A protein has these predicted regions:
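Generic preference for hydrophobic
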Residues: 62, 75, 97-98, 203-205
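A generic structural signal for well-ordered alpha-helical segments
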Residues: 52-53, 113, 140, 172
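Short acidic-hydrophobic, aromatic-tinged amphipathic segments that line or gate anion-handling sites
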Residues: 62, 119-122, 211
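Non-catalytic C-terminal accessory region of glycerolipid acyltransferases
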Residues: 3-4, 130-261
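Catalytic core of membrane glycerolipid acyltransferases/transacylases, capturing the structured
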Residues: 20-42, 53-55, 69-126
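Glycine-rich helix-loop-beta junction characteristic of Rossmann-like nucleotide cofactor-binding loops
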Residues: 64-68
């Protein structure tokens, strides 16, 4: 049953995404970016969340919304699944996602990403990528936007050892903005491999880390805060799925070496 529901979700997700982008693309050059964000990006995100709930049985629960600060902010989120690249969009005010450059090359999709002024990085050019990412993030945050980064740079399987990259500390030190850690357990329900599983993805928006801490202190704190909360959410999710809350052996990491997270 899970495989059937997963297939139907993916079919409806990719079909609706393609058709919506195709219908709206003639109007894309004429739209102000903020209008495009509300009309296209947020509608797409809410539609996908609806499909996840009604077709795949994947619900969501968010705690800690009161910790979201207005104005310039660096958001550092755990990355286990494709889920958070969609479902986190409506939670924040006009966030600029930091993402891998290759996503910009996808026909149609890349045009919308460019219009949203997300920040692409070339993960093969480490020092140049850090410089470009920082400059772009500084420009966007000066306009009052919030920057969202995945500190490990890529999806990590549930239970895999953390692999936080220096890029998040570099960005934090350069922006001079507080950092909002975000923990989640989405990898239990939308894994990279295998079917989606019904259940409740839990997101916890943690208390913000103040700006201008020493980078080493910040790096230790952001990893500690995210990983401790994620471990608790994963254990809760596993218990709800009827699994051992302590988990088994972790899958091997999927990728390594992102300069930006």
């Amino acid at each position: 049953m899970n495989r059937l529901r997963s297939f139907l979700f993916h079919l409806s997700f990719f079909t609706s995404t393609f058709l919506y982008m195709l219908v709206m693309v003639p109007f894309l050059p004429l739209m102000p970016r903020r209008f495009m964000w509300k009309l296209i990006v947020l509608v797409w995100a809410h539609t996908t969340i609806f499909l996840l709930r009604t077709v795949a049985g994947v619900r969501m629960e968010v705690k800690g919304r009161e910790n979201i600060l207005p104005g310039p902010l660096l958001i550092a989120a755990k990355h286990q699944s494709a889920w958070e690249t969609i479902a986190l969009l409506p939670l924040f005010e006009d966030p600029a996602f930091i993402l891998k450059r290759e996503l910009m090359w996808i026909p149609l999709f890349g045009w919308y990403v460019a219009k949203a002024r997300f920040i692409p990085i070339d993960r093969g050019a480490r020092s140049a990528a850090l410089k470009t990412m920082t400059e772009r993030a500084q420009l966007e945050i000066a306009k009052g936007r919030q920057i969202l980064i995945f500190p490990e740079g890529t999806r990590r399987p549930v239970g895999a050892p953390p692999s936080y990259k220096f890029g998040v500390a570099h960005l934090y030190g350069s922006l001079g903005a507080p950092c909002l850690p975000v923990a989640l357990n989405s990898g239990l329900y939308w894994p990279r491999k295998g079917p989606l599983r019904p259940g409740t993805v839990r997101v916890e928006i943690l208390p913000p880390i103040p700006a201008n801490l020493p980078r080493g202190v910040f790096m230790a704190r952001v990893e500690r805060d995210i990983e401790a909360a994620t471990a608790r959410l994963v254990a809760q999710g596993r218990a709800e799925l009827g699994e051992d809350p302590t988990g088994g052996a972790a899958e091997p990491p999927l990728e390594r070496g992102s300069p930006a997270a």
